[in-house]
Swiss-Prot record:
EC code: 1.4.3.16
Keyword DNA repair in annotation: no
Lineage: Bacteria, Pseudomonadati, Pseudomonadota, Betaproteobacteria, Neisseriales
Active-site residue numbers: R276
Cofactor requirement: FAD
Subcellular compartments: Cytoplasm
Gene name of this polypeptide: nadB
Catalysed transformations (reactions): L-aspartate + O2 = iminosuccinate + H2O2
Gene Ontology terms describing biological process: 'de novo' NAD biosynthetic process from L-aspartate
Pathway: Cofactor biosynthesis; NAD(+) biosynthesis; iminoaspartate from L-aspartate (oxidase route): step 1/1
Record protein name field: L-aspartate oxidase
A GO-annotated cellular component: cytoplasm
Record site: Important in orienting the L-aspartate substrate: E112
């Protein structure tokens, strides 16, 4: 097959850039960026990268914490395969020029919810930005890597039952074209923009996951949408809610309700350090009992210099955007969509059920996260699986997953009861508000059946897309329906999925 490149990567986050830098320099590599190279969800990551690095920690402890957070639905073999590469991943990032915070013992490690010890390597509270800056600098030095900005991947091209490239939209001209490749990699992030309140940037419209569904790839665990407990309870900027890092609680931050009472000890023995799903539901429950739509996160009991040193970007943002000095005042917070725990099913090397197609990062479902992601495991997963993927591609290894049985999209008799109550008019804000209500942190059978019926109607009535925005809307609908169907099929409250009727 005549190709335009050896490896075609749709996405420009941490997993995508790690893969490009880990492949042999003899490979012709193309990176498709929907926006700019430096505009990606990875850049907004605050907390850090979890790895068993210190003398008091070991891989078994990290595995145990990950399995507990995943609520029994992790793939333990995948967990061990990925976490065992934590230390080499940190060493690789150091070699790329990432300047992690240090102290007299070496790397300064912080602790976050669900972790039983300090194991989070970080750069203050802007780890993602620091890591991406270092990797972008390395990318620009590689003549074999071609970066194409403002190019949106639309659909997977196949030949003889294997992926052979992508159909692409030039977002500047709205023209479509094809790129043929020996290996195709989807690393376009999650589907956070199906919600009205999310920490993800506007580009996270589920493009890669939607493409995979249309191509018949196996997907899984899409019902497990992680809501971060502490999004800043202020109007969002450019469709993205500002995140108050898990590490604020890891360094002693206390959650209080409208009455000024600390409430987390009533919900879990780990209090503020419980896994995200537990803390998020606890906050939602407290908000439901009070008049204000937020709770307070207070770190002001720590020395002001400590707060400014550990959380400079949070301190700066709250002060400049909200007039809030977190060294003296509590931060108003509420749960916000943050991470897609499921995605395209892969092995730890990123191989999907479609030959020559790989998926990495938040786009993928490796089995590491199970029903709920442990804080700071996602950046680790990006680096480790991308490096393993590079090795698999270079070695020409093959992989075949189990066939994917796509759920029927015909309206059920139960869903039909909403036929007189459905909206014909579609817009992205209407979709996002609808999903926030019915596919949010607290779900029920009636809401999920209504969601499936409404989303199917919108999807059936959708016109053929021609512009970037229209293609994004197609993907948002595809992903929304997949989440709703997966959530309705899950008859067990576990991890990030909670249905009050189960």
């Amino acid at each position: 097959m005549q190709t335009d490149c050896d490896v075609l990567i749709a996405g420009n986050g941490l997993a995508a850039l790690t893969l490009a830098l880990s492949l042999p320099e003899s490979f012709r590599i193309v990176i498709l960026c929907k926006n700019r190279l430096d505009d990606t969800a990875s850049r907004h990551a605050q907390g850090g990268i979890a790895a068993a690095w210190s003398g008091e920690d070991d891989i078994e402890k990290h595995v145990a914490d990950t399995l507990e957070a995943g609520a029994g639905l992790c793939d333990e073999a995948a967990v061990r395969a990925i976490l065992s590469q934590g230390k080499p991943a940190i060493e690789w990032l150091l070699a790329q020029g990432v300047a992690f915070d240090r102290n007299h013992n070496g790397l300064h490690l912080t602790r976050e919810g669900g972790h039983t010890c300090r194991r989070i390597a970080h750069v203050a509270d802007y780890t993602g930005e620091a890591v991406m800056q270092s990797l972008i600098a390395q990318i620009r030095r590689r003549p074999n890597i071609r970066v194409c900005e403002r190019q949106m991947a639309l659909d997977i091209q196949t030949e003889s039952g294997a992926a052979c490239g992508l159909t692409v939209l030039d977002c500047r001209t709205q023209e479509t074209y094809r790129i043929r490749a020996r290996h195709t990699v989807l690393a376009g992030g999650g589907l956070g923009q199906i919600y009205a309140a999310t920490t993800t940037p506007p580009e996270c419209t589920g493009d890669a996951i939607a493409m995979a569904i249309r191509a018949g790839c196996a997907v899984g665990n899409l019902e497990f949408i992680q809501f971060h407990p502490t999004g800043l309870a202020r109007p969002s900027e450019n469709g993205r809610t500002f995140l108050i890092s898990e590490a604020v609680r890891g360094e002693g931050g206390i959650l209080t309700n409208q009455a000024g009472e600390r409430f987390m000890p009533h919900y879990d023995r780990r209090a503020e350090l419980a896994p995200r799903d537990i803390v998020a539901r606890a906050i939602a429950a407290e908000i439901a009992k009070q008049t204000q739509d937020f709770v307070s996160l207070d770190i002001s009991h720590q020395p002001a210099a400590f707060v400014r040193r550990h959380f400079p970007s949070i301190h700066r943002h709250c002060l400049s955007q909200c007039g809030l000095d977190i060294t003296r005042q509590a931060i108003p917070v509420r749960p916000v969509q943050h991470y897609t725990c499921g995605g395209i099913q892969t092995d730890p090397c990123g191989r999907t059920s479609l030959p020559q197609l790989y998926a990495l990062g938040e786009t993928a479902c490796t089995g590491l996260h199970g029903a709920n992601r442990l804080a700071s495991n996602s950046l680790l997963e990006c680096v480790v699986t991308a490096r393993l993927c590079a090795q698999a591609i270079a070695d020409g290894q093959a992989f075949q997953a189990e066939p994917f049985q796509r759920p029927s999209e015909s309206l059920s008799a139960e869903a039909g009861i909403f036929s007189d109550d459905l909206q014909n008019t579609f817009s992205r804000p209407v979709l996002q508000t609808f999903n926030q209500r019915h596919l949010g942190i607290l779900r029920n059978d009636t809401g999920l059946r209504r969601a499936i019926a409404q989303l199917q109607l919108w999807k059936q009535n959708q016109a053929e897309p021609h512009t970037a925005s229209e293609y994004e809307n197609r993907n948002l609908l595809e992903c929304s329906l997949a989440v709703a169907q997966a959530a309705y099929r899950r008859r067990q409250n576990i991890g990030a999925h909670f249905n009050s009727d189960c």
